[in-house]
Amino acid sequence: NGVPIDAVVADFMSGAIEELCPANDSKHWDIIEGQGSLFHPSFAGVSLGLLHGSQPDAFILCHEPTRTKMRGVETLLPSLDLCIEENIRLGRLTNPNIHCAGIALNTSVMSTDPKKLKDEISAKYNLPCVDPLKDDLAEIISTLKNIK
């Protein structure tokens, strides 16, 4: 099941996602994928609708480290700190227990070895940091499995 969220009237986005993500037992996961950002002026409404409607226990923050501006606009990218803080702050409106469970980096266009950057980010946030297209996901999966 799914919802083509871009085709849903804004007033009903959260409800459409909530309908797909009812409270489940601890052995069931709903994976909600969104490509927007709470900070992108063109997509923030959709991102917030997904966040509120899905009421996640955890989220994986996705980032492309060589990008300085958001795609299609001149808006600068916010820091990872601010992205994590705002996703948690706004997510707490529908799930007070939300937290960041990891960081996924798209390192495909990096000209340097991404290992150092991933290690630095992981140490700074005390979270797993991986490129999901290149790295083992065991650490992030383990973090998700340990959600109470």
Question: How would you label these PLM feature ranges?
Answer:
Residues 1-148:
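Flexible phosphate-sensing "switch/lid" loops adjacent to ATP/NTP-binding sites
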